[in-house]
Curated annotation (Swiss-Prot):
Down-regulation by RAC1 during pathogen infection may potentiate ROS which function as signals in resistance response. Plants silencing MT2C show abnormal plant growth and root formation. GO terms for molecular function: metal ion binding. The gene is MT2C. Disulfide bonds: none annotated. GO terms for cellular component: cytosol. Its main location: cytoplasm. Induction: By Fe, Zn and auxin in roots, and Cu and Mn in shoots. Down-regulated by cytokinin and cold stress in roots and shoots. Down-regulated by Cu and salt stress in roots. Sinergically down-regulated by RAC1 and sphingolipid elicitor. This is Metallothionein-like protein 2C. Pfam families: Metallothio_2.
Length: 84
């Protein structure tokens, strides 16, 4: 769950007071933090790596795969693992 389920500024768990703008200020934070696409590719017999390779694709956050967000000190918004 990220930033109190997308409710930045709601309760002590977010560690931001009313300055965040209240509940559901960033409803898309939860959706982008939990949407991940994993692509697994097995090398051919001619490949020299001899193992599985994994690539992670993400449409947002520059490929950041973290799912825990934390509010900034100015309560201006939430940033996921400083990947914004």
């Amino acid at each position: 769950m990220s930033c109190c389920g997308g409710n930045c500024g709601c309760g002590s768990g977010c560690q931001c007071g009313g300055g965040c703008g209240g509940c559901k200020m960033f409803p898309d934070v939860e959706a982008t933090a939990t949407t991940k696409t994993f692509v697994l590719a097995a090398p051919s017999n001619k490949a020299s790596s001899g193992g599985m390779e994994m690539a992670v694709e993400s449409g947002e956050n520059g490929g950041c795969g973290c799912n825990t967000c934390k509010c900034g000190t100015s309560c201006s918004g939430c940033s996921c693992c400083s990947c914004n």
